[in-house]
């Protein structure tokens, strides 16, 4: 899904001579940049030269591949980022730069549904670059800024993906849009908590450094540093939530949009102990420290820094504690620093009085993940599963569940009039994964933030794109609202329908209205249906589809009461039972061993001569 836009050129008979002259003067692109002051910007690090791009309705300015940190290579691997040192001359910012080193999805080679999320630039650990799109010419007055944080399970993703093209929002809505790369997987989230060599959460620190860069430099592009909105999807949305919960980040933005992800999701963080276990297991898998000896943190990290990046990526998935889906190997850690406590605790105790938040989900959050390991599922058939496959899928989809908790999930999601129906079982499995990992954490976050003083708006996205290549049974999968938010249907070459183009314009307006005012509604349009705030009492949210806005109440309220209220209590109770059972078994084992020992001693005693005389 790559929009076929190219830099604007003005045809001229004199162009070949002009090009030759400019080449002799030091390069056509550089000279063209000097001729157009709109494409030259000075930031704190030095001067940049951008590029003018076509977009529907007119051109935009793009400044691509701007370095905001020193390359995190060599001894900087696993370390917090360092700000980019100043450069001399004019830095070329006309093309995207490297993608951070990561796992590449090869499950369905050549299939657009997976390839659109795979890296589209060279993989490298030298990857900390950001991009800025602005209206052309530059805004005369400070313009609200939108900062995009991509998703990808904290193990993949890139700001340069075609689906994140910022030109449409910049041109149609007059927004200043920023996106950044951040380290993922082992390189961004391997943690030995308490260690200076690999403290963890450096991918989040990459994001924070980019936010600081925006505060220092965005005014030069026409952006308003006093009106910054973060928005992200999936792990990007979880990242946005973690910046909300991390005090040093809170002064760097003013509003937040969380699309299909939260910091309180069961996949979004791990404890310090689990992070250390995964890091040391990865080290052992790649032969660190050499010889298999114990070694301290410094020796372990020094060894890991010598290993090729691909070796680390190849072993990432082997550190997960059990077979699962929607679980990722290296993710943010509750480190006592970036995250001073668990996200749940911080959400419950935080003060969000001055915060405006937009949160939401898509209709079928779980379906995308089922083809990555749940028995019976594939993109190439209807995935009509048996009850046995459903039961096995629940254990993979809710990996932390005890036997009793898994049985409760099965009980809740089974259609007891048709308990063996393959279609229902398939759809129920999708709902289990989506509700558990996305929908109910979003509902919980919306309620808690609203209760703590934030102004919250909520949505469910229900439109399946006419161009979608995933099978019909997957519905509206995770991630497939993004193309509408970024305005890709406005590109006629991508073959969206007219209705989808109008729908995309509507969504772009909602998102940019929210970025400007903290309210997605247009204050100049009193005739259109209004999007009400989400409150703990009314729990109002809207459906986003080709129809007019519809207000609903209670986002999967009954089901989310199961996940957010009942199941945690059940898990807590069964944890106690499991511990009691473990202790009982240990005591029984000790007692049994004692009895065997006693019987052996008794038998030995009985065989002695004095006993035989009795």
Swiss-Prot record:
**In which domain of life is the source organism classified?**
Eukaryota
Q: Quick one: a GO biological-process term for this protein? A: positive regulation of cold-induced thermogenesis
* Cellular component terms (Gene Ontology): basement membrane; cell surface; extracellular space; Golgi apparatus; neuromuscular junction; perinuclear region of cytoplasm; plasma membrane; side of membrane
Which residues catalyse the reaction?
A: 234 (acyl-ester intermediate), 365 (charge relay system), 478 (charge relay system)
Compartment(s) of residence: Synapse; Secreted; Cell membrane
What's the protein's topology in the membrane?
Answer: Peripheral membrane protein
Indicate the enzyme's highest-level EC class: hydrolase
Disulfide bridge map: 100-127, 288-303, 440-560
What reactions does this protein catalyze?
A: acetylcholine + H2O = choline + acetate + H(+)
| Glycosylation positions in this chain | 296, 381, 495
The entry's note on the tissues where this protein occurs is: Predominates in most expressing tissues except erythrocytes where a glycophospholipid-attached form of ACHE predominates.
Task of the protein: Terminates signal transduction at the neuromuscular junction by rapid hydrolysis of the acetylcholine released into the synaptic cleft.
Stated name of the protein = Acetylcholinesterase
